[in-house]
Each structure stands twice: as structure tokens, then as C-alpha cells.
A protein has these predicted regions:
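Eukaryotic partner-binding/assembly regions in large regulatory complexes
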Residues: 1-89
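Leucine-rich, amphipathic alpha-helical/linker segments
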Residues: 12-16, 26-29, 33, 85, ...
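Short, leucine-enriched amphipathic alpha-helices that occur as contiguous helical runs
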Residues: 23, 102-103, 123, 152
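Short capping segments at the starts of secondary-structure elements
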Residues: 33-35, 118-121
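Positively charged, polyanion-binding regions of nucleic-acid-associated proteins
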Residues: 89-93, 97-120
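DNA-recognition alpha helix
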Residues: 122-136
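Accessory, usually C-terminal, subdomains that scaffold auxiliary metal cofactors
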Residues: 141-202
């Protein structure tokens, strides 16, 4: 019975969008098997993420670490030293696995737009999507309007940064090809659900 009370969706993603450049630093710390002291030195003292406050830096570091920790060191290496495109898609893959809210939006809403030849998202898409999420997870009904708006902002920004839409204002859908290196990694590591989300435009 307790398992049914576990939220299917959560708002952890509000801490930041893709955070590509920041993810390079976190991947490096993970690859180096850094101690808690090393993390504090890098994130708080040295401010490698270049945030305005220690609280913001720690919040984003926590989010990125949670994302990347779901993947293997092989992906961390792509994040840390890959090209801009490779790093972006590697970070996106981790973000999709970390956030069911992002994953399902891509796999259902955006996929349907491509299948029905609707070339752009609408403001109503997010509202309707959250209603469908609430049917699967009643916890969604407890989210405030501010939280819903922030989640929309972050998800749309992620889609823009990853090249799936041309901007957060126009919301025009763009075709995306998954880089072979990323695709091979996802297949080899049985991340087919993540790959399915990333291949929605194909």
C-alpha cells in the first residue's frame, strides 16, 4: 500500500534547466571520486559553478549530481570532455531519466505534435499535460500555481537548450537527431526509455 503513495512526479527540476557548463564541473568531481571536502571547496569556496550565492550553487550542484549519478562514468566522461553537442545530449539524457515530468512531456505531448503535424507547442499544452499527470499522481494537485509556472519555464527552457524547440516564446518544434555516440551509450546501457524520448522527432 505504501508504494501507491510515492509521487510519480516531483518538482525537483525547478533548481535549473540543462545546466550544461555546470554539469561539466560536476562530472569532473564525480570522475575524480571527490570527497565531501573537495565538493565543498569546489562548489562553495571556489564557486566553480559561478553562482551568486552558496545556496544557489549547492542547489544546482545537488540537482546535477542527482541526474548524473543515475548514469555511468562513461556518460560522465562525455559530459566532462565531449563537444558542445555531445555534452548537451548527454546531460539531456540524464535529465530525462531523473525527471519523469520532463520524460513524459516529451514522450506524449511533443510526440503527438509530431505525429499530428502540429508544428508548435501552445500555452494550453502544459495545462492539459498537468491535468493528465494529476490523474496518474494526485500529488500534482497540491502544486501551487507558482510551482506549475516554474516547472513549465524549466521544461520549455530545457527543450529550447536541447534544440527541440526554437525558443521559449515561439515554441516552434525542431527536428533533432540523436548523436550516434549518445545513442550507442543508451542502447548499450539499456536506457531505451530515455532514447525513446530523445528520438521523438524521428
Amino acid at each position: 500500500m505504501a508504494a501507491t503513495n510515492i509521487p510519480k512526479y516531483n518538482g525537483a527540476i525547478t533548481a535549473g534547466a540543462l545546466l550544461v557548463s555546470e554539469s561539466r564541473h560536476i562530472a569532473r568531481l564525480l570522475l575524480n571520486q571527490s570527497s565531501s571536502g573537495d565538493w565543498h571547496q569546489a562548489i562553495v569556496v571556489d564557486n566553480v559553478l559561478q553562482k551568486r550565492s552558496p545556496a544557489s550553487a549547492k542547489s544546482q550542484a545537488k540537482l546535477i549530481k542527482a541526474r548524473l549519478s543515475l548514469m555511468t562514468p562513461e556518460l560522465w566522461k562525455m559530459v566532462e570532455s565531449g563537444s558542445a553537442d555531445v555534452t548537451t545530449q548527454a546531460v539531456l539524457a540524464a535529465a530525462i531519466k531523473h525527471s519523469r515530468l520532463l520524460a513524459d512531456f516529451m514522450d506524449t505531448v511533443i510526440r503527438q505534435h509530431w505525429q499530428t503535424f502540429v508544428p508548435k507547442l501552445s500555452t494550453r499544452d502544459w495545462t492539459d499535460y498537468l491535468k493528465s499527470c494529476a490523474q496518474l499522481d494526485p500529488h500534482v494537485n497540491q502544486w501551487s500555481d507558482a510551482t506549475r509556472a516554474k516547472l513549465k519555464q524549466i521544461v520549455y527552457l530545457i527543450l529550447s537548450q536541447a534544440g527541440y524547440i526554437d525558443g521559449t516564446r515561439t515554441l516552434k518544434l525542431l527536428p533533432v537527431s540523436v548523436i550516434p555516440e549518445i545513442r550507442a551509450y543508451l542502447i548499450d546501457n539499456n536506457e531505451t526509455d530515455v532514447l525513446r524520448c530523445m528520438e521523438i522527432t524521428q
